[in-house]
């Protein structure tokens, strides 16, 4: 038997957790995610957005939303750009662990759409220019995973 999630979201409800830090990037990721959800038939009224101060706060809010069982998927969007200190490494590691743990405590898929880049140019490329829009990619993953879990 094969299981495969469909890419139609007409009956899905999706939450997006987005960081306000580096909002010149995260706003593009959010636009890409919302546009993609709508293009895949998720009703705009079924898309809720929670804003958090920075990437570090994303996992807690994502976990809380996923545990509510009101959503078929939760998308996390943020942007961490390497600076001149080790802060980048700590934030990236803890955010990735936190999002992963959120998947462990609920049956709602929590999708990792957080950019971790070496510089601003890489972030811009992944927010809608050369390398596509990682927010849009996260939205496709959310739809597929939500439908796959319904099928299993």
From Swiss-Prot:
<dbReference type="Pfam" id="PF00885">
    <property type="entry name" value="DMRL_synthase"/>
</dbReference>
<dbReference type="InterPro" id="IPR002180">
    <property type="entry name" value="LS/RS"/>
</dbReference>
<feature type="binding site">
    <location>
        <begin position="55"/>
        <end position="57"/>
    </location>
    <ligand>
        <name>5-amino-6-(D-ribitylamino)uracil</name>
    </ligand>
</feature>
<dbReference type="GO" id="GO:0005829">
    <property type="term" value="C:cytosol"/>
</dbReference>
<dbReference type="GO" id="GO:0009231">
    <property type="term" value="P:riboflavin biosynthetic process"/>
</dbReference>
<comment type="similarity">
    <text>Belongs to the DMRL synthase family.</text>
</comment>
<feature type="binding site">
    <location>
        <position position="21"/>
    </location>
    <ligand>
        <name>5-amino-6-(D-ribitylamino)uracil</name>
    </ligand>
</feature>
<feature type="binding site">
    <location>
        <position position="112"/>
    </location>
    <ligand>
        <name>5-amino-6-(D-ribitylamino)uracil</name>
    </ligand>
</feature>
<feature type="active site" description="Proton donor">
    <location>
        <position position="87"/>
    </location>
</feature>
<dbReference type="GO" id="GO:0000906">
    <property type="term" value="F:6,7-dimethyl-8-ribityllumazine synthase activity"/>
</dbReference>
<feature type="binding site">
    <location>
        <begin position="79"/>
        <end position="81"/>
    </location>
    <ligand>
        <name>5-amino-6-(D-ribitylamino)uracil</name>
    </ligand>
</feature>
<keyword id="KW-0808">Transferase</keyword>
<feature type="binding site">
    <location>
        <begin position="84"/>
        <end position="85"/>
    </location>
    <ligand>
        <name>(2S)-2-hydroxy-3-oxobutyl phosphate</name>
    </ligand>
</feature>
<feature type="binding site">
    <location>
        <position position="126"/>
    </location>
    <ligand>
        <name>(2S)-2-hydroxy-3-oxobutyl phosphate</name>
    </ligand>
</feature>
<dbReference type="InterPro" id="IPR034964">
    <property type="entry name" value="LS"/>
</dbReference>
<keyword id="KW-0686">Riboflavin biosynthesis</keyword>
<comment type="subunit">
    <text>Forms an icosahedral capsid composed of 60 subunits, arranged as a dodecamer of pentamers.</text>
</comment>
<comment type="function">
    <text>Catalyzes the formation of 6,7-dimethyl-8-ribityllumazine by condensation of 5-amino-6-(D-ribitylamino)uracil with 3,4-dihydroxy-2-butanone 4-phosphate. This is the penultimate step in the biosynthesis of riboflavin.</text>
</comment>
<dbReference type="InterPro" id="IPR036467">
    <property type="entry name" value="LS/RS_sf"/>
</dbReference>
<dbReference type="GO" id="GO:0009349">
    <property type="term" value="C:riboflavin synthase complex"/>
</dbReference>
<protein>
    <recommendedName>
        <fullName>6,7-dimethyl-8-ribityllumazine synthase</fullName>
        <ecNumber>2.5.1.78</ecNumber>
    </recommendedName>
</protein>
<comment type="pathway">
    <text>Cofactor biosynthesis; riboflavin biosynthesis; riboflavin from 2-hydroxy-3-oxobutyl phosphate and 5-amino-6-(D-ribitylamino)uracil: step 1/2.</text>
</comment>
């Amino acid at each position: 038997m094969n299981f495969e999630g469909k890419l139609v979201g007409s009956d899905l409800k999706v939450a997006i957790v987005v960081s306000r830090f580096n909002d010149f990037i995260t706003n593009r990721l959010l636009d890409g995610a919302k546009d993609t959800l709508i293009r895949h038939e998720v009703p705009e009224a079924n898309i809720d957005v929670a804003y958090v101060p920075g990437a570090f706060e994303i996992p807690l809010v994502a976990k809380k939303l996923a545990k509510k069982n009101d959503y078929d998927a939760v998308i996390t969007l943020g942007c961490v750009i390497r600076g001149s200190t080790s802060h980048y490494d700590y934030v990236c590691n803890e955010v990735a662990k936190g999002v992963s743990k959120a998947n462990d405590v609920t049956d709602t898929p929590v999708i990792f759409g957080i950019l971790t880049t070496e510089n601003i140019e890489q972030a811009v490329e992944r927010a809608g220019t050369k390398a596509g829009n990682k927010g849009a990619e996260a939205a496709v993953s959310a739809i597929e995973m939500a439908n796959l879990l319904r099928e299993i």
